[in-house]
Amino acid sequence: MKKILLFIFSLLYITNCFAQETIQKKNRITDNVVEKFGVLKDNEEVKDGPYEAMYRRKVPVAMGNYTKGKKTGSWRFYDPGGKLMQIYDYDNHQLKYEAKEYTGTSDFYYTIDKEIADTDRITKPIKAGGRYYGYLPYLGMYKLPFNPYEYGTYGCVAVVELLISPLGRLASYKVRTVCNTLEYDQSITMNTKLFKEEDRQFIPATLNGEPIVSRILIRCQVKQDGGLEFIRE
C-alpha cells in the first residue's frame, strides 16, 4: 500500500513539474469585442489554455483552447447575435460546420475569374473563424487616410477585397472607400505581410474539385474614428 501511495505522489509531483503556470490576460480587438485568454507566466507571448472573445461583454463570438501558442481542438465561432457560424477542428485542419449564407442578408460577395457552366460545382473560399470573428483582422487593419474628425465620415462606405490564391494564401488586400458627401473615391492596397501568418491562410475556392483563384468582397461602413465595421453588426 505504501508503495502504491508513493507511486501516486511521484506521478503528481512529476505532473506538477511539467505543468506551466499561466496568467490571465484581456485584449480589446475592436470597440465591441474583448478577448480573454491565458499566457505562460515565463513567456507572455505564448497563449495557453481556454480562450474566449466576447461581443459587448455578453455574447461569445469565439471559444476554444490554446496549447503552447497554437489553437487546438474544435473551436466554435458565433455572430454578434449568438448564432453559430462555424466549427473548426484545428488539430486536423478540418471544417466541421459552416452556417448557410444568404445573399440578401450577407455583407460578403465572392467572385472567380472564370466562366461558369450550369453543370459546374463551385465552393466559395472560407476563413477559419467564421464570417464575423474570422474577418475582424481585415477590417481592423484599415483607417481612413485623412482626419475623420475634421471632415466627417457621414455617408462613407468601403469594400474590403481579399484575393485568395489556389493554395489558400492571401495574395492581395485592397480597400476601396467612397464618401459621396466629400466626393472621395479611392482604393488603397496594403502589404499582406502586415497580417499574422494565420490571417494569411484560407480554405481556397474550388471549381469542380480543383482549387482556383477567388476574391472575397466585404461591404463595410466607416466608423467615426475612420475605422471599418460590418454594415450588419
Question: Whereabouts are the PLM-identified features?
Answer:
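Bacterial Sec-dependent N-terminal signal peptides
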Residues: 1-25
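Charge-biased low-complexity segments
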Residues: 23-233
